[in-house]
A protein has these predicted regions:
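Hydrophobic membrane-insertion alpha-helices, especially the h-region
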Residues: 1-8
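Alpha-helix capping and helix-coil boundary motifs
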Residues: 8, 45-49, 131
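Extracellular pro-sequences of secreted precursors
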Residues: 12-13
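Secondary-structure boundary elements
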Residues: 18-77, 139
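Hydrophobic/aromatic-rich core segments of domains that either
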Residues: 40, 85-145
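Short, conserved alpha-helical segments within structured domains
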Residues: 49, 79, 106-108
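Periplasmic OmpA-like peptidoglycan-binding domain that tethers envelope proteins to the cell wall
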Residues: 74-89
Length: 145
């Protein structure tokens, strides 16, 4: 998969053409407790932690909505979300566990990338400033990343 144009989202509001993407990343108590619960049996194993959080998010049903991205808590409570809702949930979980992760916006889609310093997986990745970022797709189901 080759992306000729993409945006790394680092700000709460990112203007893209005629629209604005609203980043709903949360590092609150709710998200911290959820991340801790999802990773409690991982014993600080990075791959286990990331995979457990990704599995949780991908099990939430995908449903397109026309509103701005929802908060992580709202996505869990309503038990559905589109790519931006589910990506906001995943990146929030990753951030509270201190992982370096970013949103990537491509035409009509958003996904998460993560840097796993010192871990070399045999997986597709994006390179940003000579740093390897693995792609985490929140809309995939039953797929090991």
């Amino acid at each position: 998969m080759i992306y000729s144009s993409f945006f790394i989202v680092k700000n709460q509001f990112t203007d893209i053409g005629d629209s604005t993407y609203v980043n709903q990343v949360r590092v609150d108590d709710y998200t911290k407790k959820l991340a801790d619960f999802l990773t409690k049996n991982c014993k600080q194993d990075t791959i286990c932690e990331v995979q457990n959080m990704l599995d949780f998010v991908t099990q939430i049903p995908y449903k397109i909505n026309e509103s701005i991205a929802k908060s992580p808590k709202k996505v869990v409570e309503q038990n559905f979300g589109d790519c931006d809702d589910k990506s906001n949930l995943l990146i929030s979980l990753l951030k509270v566990k201190d992982y370096e992760a970013y949103f990537v916006l491509v035409p009509n889609h958003i996904f998460v990338i993560i840097n796993l310093e010192g871990i070399n997986l045999n997986k597709k990745a994006l390179y940003v400033n000579n740093k390897k970022y693995y792609i985490l797709e929140t809309t995939a189901t039953k797929k090991k990343q």
